[in-house]
Regions:
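Surface-exposed loop and adjacent secondary-structure segments within mature catalytic domains
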Residues: 1-2, 7-17, 37-40, 53-119, ...
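Short HxH-centered metal-ligating active-site micro-motif
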Residues: 11, 16-32
Length: 171
């Protein structure tokens, strides 16, 4: 029904479930996002009550726990190999400074966040194939940022739109 509704104005979409695609850690060294994704999936599977029942009865939730599994594995290996027995909060500690190529990139040393449009890599092709199959109403792309440099991007706010973005991309 969801795909039919995209091409048919006579379909009553209010009776269809909303499709949500949640993607995490496109940069493998942003590991807290993949961990948050697993916690969110667990919550959705384990929670009880009318609110969660209503959400799950009216929503199709697609999880991609790691857009970049190769980078996440590389980062996890680095962090686990270089961590101290006692957590070291010093930002200059070796654990927090990966050597090249680090976990940001995938197996081919490519920044997966730059492959949304060209769709050259296997991970991106699989992701786009899933998008074409489900046509999600909502897509989330969870990133990790420094504690003093976070921001929230909300499409549709005129003051947040780059003036070089063509109007057709905004419509």
């Amino acid at each position: 029904n969801h795909i039919e509704a995209t091409n048919n104005n006579s379909v009553d979409v209010s009776k269809n479930p909303i499709v949500v695609y949640q993607g995490f850690s496109i940069h493998g060294n942003e590991a807290s996002r993949s961990n948050a994704g697993l916690a969110a999936a667990y919550y959705l599977a384990a929670a009880n009550g009318n609110k969660i029942d209503d959400l799950l009865n009216n929503t199709i939730i697609l999880f991609d726990p790691s857009f970049n599994p190769d980078g996440l594995q590389r980062f996890a290996y680095w962090a686990n190999t270089n961590k101290a027995n006692t957590i070291n909060p010093d930002p200059n500690d070796r654990e927090y400074h990966e050597v090249w190529p680090g976990g940001r990139t995938n197996h081919y040393w490519f920044d997966m966040n730059r492959d949304w449009l060209p769709v050259q890599l296997p991970e991106s092709r699989a992701r786009i194939e899933s998008f074409h199959k489900w046509l999600p109403n909502i897509l989330t792309d969870h990133h990790e940022m420094g504690s003093n440099s976070s921001f929230f991007f909300q499409p549709g706010i005129p003051s947040r739109t780059n003036p070089l973005t063509p109007q057709m991309n905004q419509d």
